[in-house]
């Protein structure tokens, strides 16, 4: 068994909360494999390429990756080439604003925001 029933249900709950973000992202795809479970696949659409795949270990793992991607979108938007923990106050405010709808639905994962902002994985 790849995940317990409870683990898979929780991963699917996180997936549903981030469904629109997952659907719209040009940088990754979340796929199901009967062999290994959920796989986070780094991709590109212009040019088209497939890069690395990482197995999603838990709902917290998926939430971390999604929140990190939301924050990365803000950093790309501002054109600044630096790590999340070095975001300026305006970037930080926008990141937190974009995280809010997700964390409101997944409050048990709010600690992940602090982990991301401090550079912890």
State what each model feature region is.
Residues 32-106:
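Acidic, low-complexity, intrinsically disordered interaction modules
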Residues 1-29:
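Negatively charged, low-complexity tracts enriched in Asp/Glu with abundant Ser/Thr
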Residues 119-121:
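Short acidic DE-rich linear segments
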């Amino acid at each position: 068994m790849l995940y317990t029933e409870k683990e898979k249900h929780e991963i699917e709950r996180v997936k549903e909360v981030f469904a629109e973000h997952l659907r719209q992202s040009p940088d990754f795809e979340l796929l199901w494999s009967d062999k290994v479970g959920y796989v986070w696949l780094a991709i590109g659409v212009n040019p088209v390429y497939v890069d690395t795949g990482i197995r999603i270990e838990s709902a917290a793992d998926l939430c971390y990756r999604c929140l990190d991607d939301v924050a990365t979108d803000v950093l790309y938007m501002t054109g600044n080439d630096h790590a999340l923990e070095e975001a300026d106050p305006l970037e930080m405010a926008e990141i937190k604003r974009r995280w809010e709808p997700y964390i409101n639905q997944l409050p048990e994962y709010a600690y992940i925001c602090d982990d991301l902002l401090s550079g912890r994985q």
